[in-house]
Protein backbone atom coordinates (compact mmCIF):
# COMPACT_ATOMS: atom_id res chain seq x y z
CA UNK A 1 0.00 0.00 0.00
CA UNK A 2 1.10 3.51 -0.72
CA UNK A 3 -0.31 6.90 -1.46
CA UNK A 4 -0.89 8.90 -4.61
CA UNK A 5 -1.46 12.67 -4.81
CA UNK A 6 -4.97 13.57 -6.03
CA UNK A 7 -4.92 16.95 -7.84
CA UNK A 8 -8.72 17.28 -7.59
CA UNK A 9 -8.78 17.18 -3.78
CA UNK A 10 -5.21 18.08 -2.86
CA UNK A 11 -5.12 14.94 -0.69
CA UNK A 12 -3.08 11.78 -0.67
CA UNK A 13 -5.31 8.85 -1.64
CA UNK A 14 -4.69 5.24 -0.64
CA UNK A 15 -3.26 3.27 -3.55
CA UNK A 16 -4.79 -0.17 -3.95
CA UNK A 17 -3.15 -3.34 -5.18
CA UNK A 18 -1.24 -2.96 -8.41
CA UNK A 19 -0.83 0.79 -7.95
CA UNK A 20 -4.45 1.65 -8.79
CA UNK A 21 -5.87 4.44 -6.69
CA UNK A 22 -8.80 3.49 -4.48
CA UNK A 23 -12.18 5.11 -5.18
CA UNK A 24 -12.58 8.59 -3.75
CA UNK A 25 -15.84 9.67 -2.14
CA UNK A 26 -16.94 13.30 -2.11
CA UNK A 27 -19.96 15.12 -0.74
CA UNK A 28 -20.97 18.25 -2.63
CA UNK A 29 -23.06 20.61 -0.51
CA UNK A 30 -24.98 23.08 -2.66
CA UNK A 31 -26.66 26.09 -1.07
CA UNK A 32 -29.86 26.71 -3.04
CA UNK A 33 -31.00 29.82 -1.16
CA UNK A 34 -30.07 32.13 1.67
CA UNK A 35 -30.93 31.13 5.23
CA UNK A 36 -34.05 33.23 5.84
CA UNK A 37 -35.96 34.08 2.64
CA UNK A 38 -38.98 31.90 1.81
CA UNK A 39 -38.23 29.42 -0.97
CA UNK A 40 -40.06 29.74 -4.28
CA UNK A 41 -40.64 27.15 -6.98
CA UNK A 42 -38.76 27.25 -10.26
CA UNK A 43 -36.34 25.51 -12.58
CA UNK A 44 -32.56 25.89 -12.45
CA UNK A 45 -32.55 27.64 -9.07
CA UNK A 46 -28.87 26.64 -8.97
CA UNK A 47 -26.63 25.73 -11.90
CA UNK A 48 -23.08 24.37 -11.71
CA UNK A 49 -20.76 22.05 -13.63
CA UNK A 50 -19.40 18.76 -12.36
CA UNK A 51 -15.70 19.22 -11.52
CA UNK A 52 -15.02 15.56 -12.43
CA UNK A 53 -16.93 12.48 -13.58
CA UNK A 54 -18.45 10.40 -10.82
CA UNK A 55 -21.17 8.06 -9.66
CA UNK A 56 -24.03 9.57 -7.69
CA UNK A 57 -24.58 7.19 -4.76
CA UNK A 58 -26.99 9.19 -2.56
CA UNK A 59 -28.75 12.55 -2.28
CA UNK A 60 -30.09 14.52 0.66
CA UNK A 61 -31.72 17.89 1.28
CA UNK A 62 -31.97 20.01 4.42
CA UNK A 63 -33.57 23.33 5.34
CA UNK A 64 -33.18 25.73 8.24
CA UNK A 65 -36.94 26.47 8.26
CA UNK A 66 -39.22 23.47 7.75
CA UNK A 67 -41.97 23.56 5.10
CA UNK A 68 -45.46 23.55 6.64
CA UNK A 69 -48.68 22.40 5.00
CA UNK A 70 -47.04 20.22 2.36
CA UNK A 71 -43.67 18.71 1.49
CA UNK A 72 -40.77 20.53 -0.16
CA UNK A 73 -39.87 18.72 -3.41
CA UNK A 74 -36.54 19.12 -5.22
CA UNK A 75 -35.30 17.71 -8.53
CA UNK A 76 -31.69 17.31 -9.68
CA UNK A 77 -30.93 17.38 -13.41
CA UNK A 78 -27.91 16.55 -15.55
CA UNK A 79 -27.98 18.34 -18.93
CA UNK A 80 -31.68 19.10 -18.44
CA UNK A 81 -32.76 15.54 -17.59
CA UNK A 82 -33.69 14.42 -14.08
CA UNK A 83 -31.35 11.93 -12.41
CA UNK A 84 -34.14 10.97 -9.98
CA UNK A 85 -37.13 8.70 -10.69
CA UNK A 86 -38.55 9.65 -7.27
CA UNK A 87 -37.74 13.25 -6.41
CA UNK A 88 -36.04 14.42 -3.24
CA UNK A 89 -38.53 15.55 -0.60
CA UNK A 90 -38.63 17.06 2.86
CA UNK A 91 -41.90 16.20 4.57
CA UNK A 92 -44.28 18.72 6.14
CA UNK A 93 -42.74 20.01 9.39
CA UNK A 94 -39.36 18.29 8.87
CA UNK A 95 -35.93 19.86 8.23
CA UNK A 96 -34.28 16.96 6.40
CA UNK A 97 -35.03 14.47 3.65
CA UNK A 98 -33.35 11.76 5.75
CA UNK A 99 -36.71 11.10 7.44
CA UNK A 100 -38.87 11.42 4.29
CA UNK A 101 -41.80 9.01 4.07
CA UNK A 102 -40.86 8.47 0.40
CA UNK A 103 -37.09 8.48 -0.14
CA UNK A 104 -35.51 9.76 -3.35
CA UNK A 105 -34.59 7.17 -5.97
CA UNK A 106 -31.58 7.74 -8.25
CA UNK A 107 -32.32 6.61 -11.82
CA UNK A 108 -29.18 7.95 -13.56
CA UNK A 109 -26.12 7.68 -11.34
CA UNK A 110 -23.40 8.37 -13.95
CA UNK A 111 -22.49 12.07 -13.89
CA UNK A 112 -20.11 13.20 -16.65
CA UNK A 113 -17.12 15.48 -16.20
CA UNK A 114 -18.16 19.11 -16.85
CA UNK A 115 -21.86 18.15 -17.07
CA UNK A 116 -24.28 20.97 -16.31
CA UNK A 117 -26.18 20.19 -13.12
CA UNK A 118 -29.32 22.15 -12.22
CA UNK A 119 -31.48 22.03 -9.13
CA UNK A 120 -35.21 22.70 -9.43
CA UNK A 121 -37.59 23.46 -6.59
CA UNK A 122 -40.86 21.83 -7.67
CA UNK A 123 -42.94 22.39 -4.53
CA UNK A 124 -42.65 24.37 -1.30
CA UNK A 125 -44.77 24.16 1.84
CA UNK A 126 -48.30 25.50 1.38
CA UNK A 127 -48.44 27.32 4.74
CA UNK A 128 -44.75 28.04 5.30
CA UNK A 129 -42.51 27.69 2.27
CA UNK A 130 -39.35 26.67 4.07
CA UNK A 131 -35.98 28.44 3.86
CA UNK A 132 -32.26 27.73 3.85
CA UNK A 133 -32.24 24.86 1.35
CA UNK A 134 -29.07 22.82 0.90
CA UNK A 135 -28.76 19.82 -1.42
CA UNK A 136 -26.11 17.17 -0.80
CA UNK A 137 -24.70 15.01 -3.62
CA UNK A 138 -22.74 11.94 -2.52
CA UNK A 139 -20.29 11.13 -5.33
CA UNK A 140 -17.78 8.32 -5.82
CA UNK A 141 -14.93 8.79 -8.30
CA UNK A 142 -12.34 6.36 -9.52
Which positions does each model-derived feature cover?
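Extracellular Ig-like/FN3 beta-sandwich strand-entry sites
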Residues: 53, 112-116
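Terminal beta-strand-rich extracellular "head" domains
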Residues: 62-113
Amino acid sequence: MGYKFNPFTGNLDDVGEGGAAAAVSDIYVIACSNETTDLTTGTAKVTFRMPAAGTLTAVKATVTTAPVGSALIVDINEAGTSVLSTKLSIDDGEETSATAATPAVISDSALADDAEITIDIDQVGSGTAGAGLKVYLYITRG
